[in-house]
Amino acid sequence: MARNDLQGSLDLLVLKTLSQMEELHGYGIVLHIQRASDELLSVEEGSLYPALHRMEMSGWIRSEWKVTDTSRKAKYYRLTPAGQKELQSAEKSFEQLVKGIRAILRYA
């Protein structure tokens, strides 16, 4: 269970970002996570795009090709109602994981 929670951290970060920003392209998601974490977290694009594809296949996000402000085509991602439910579940699971880690750190 904890291993899945740790591996699901990227999903949680992406879903939370899309819940706050409505829609973003992949690089925008990377930048938002970096800025929102005060540069403590960074997401490699090589990890992000497979995760976005998997989340889209799961129905948690949907995508649409659009033209950016710099006149380039980019795939923009948006949270779905199923993604909102998954976000709520992932937040609860993550809080439980953090609670467990805190308990161990206090014990040690």
Predicted regions and their residues:
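N-terminal helix-turn-helix DNA-binding core of bacterial DNA-binding proteins
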Residues: 4-47
